[in-house]
């Protein structure tokens, strides 16, 4: 397998992994069903995107260049998308608490158990939505990377 094939198949692997995770997460988000497997898949997809970015760096160091400079944008943006998605995920809890006029997590503890569970589920659902959407965006970018080598 040559450098070109390695770059293309690496991008396809990132696209498939993140596409599956994104679709699974979107389905679980729609059904209000938190999932441990989704979060493991998200982390695996992010790890694969990071490994692909390292491969791109190796290709640059080996003076193996794609046919289009856009390749670098499509190949490296998934790492940035993952970082931005994590930042948005961190804001999700604050948004849910603000929506329910709660100051902080300690204020949630004063609520009845059913309301606490509803707030936790709302936070998890919002986080899943953000990360599922990010995984789908990474999928599209990786497919574009494969097409621009």
Segments from the language model and where they lie:
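Polytopic transmembrane helical bundles with strong interfacial aromatic enrichment
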Residues: 1-149
């Amino acid at each position: 397998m040559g450098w070109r094939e390695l770059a293309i198949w690496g991008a396809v692997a990132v696209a498939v992994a993140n596409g599956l995770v994104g679709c699974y997460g979107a389905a679980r988000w729609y059904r209000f069903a938190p999932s441990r497997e989704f979060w493991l898949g998200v982390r695996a997809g992010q790890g694969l995107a990071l490994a692909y970015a390292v491969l791109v760096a190796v290709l640059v160091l080996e003076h193996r260049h794609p046919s289009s400079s856009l390749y670098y944008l499509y190949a490296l943006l998934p790492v940035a998308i993952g970082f931005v998605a994590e930042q948005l995920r961190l804001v999700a809890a604050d948004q849910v608490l603000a929506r329910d006029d709660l100051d902080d997590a300690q204020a949630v503890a004063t609520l009845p158990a059913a309301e606490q569970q509803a707030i936790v589920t709302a936070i998890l659902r919002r986080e899943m939505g953000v990360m599922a959407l990010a995984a789908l965006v990474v999928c599209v970018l990786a497919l574009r990377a494969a097409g621009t080598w």
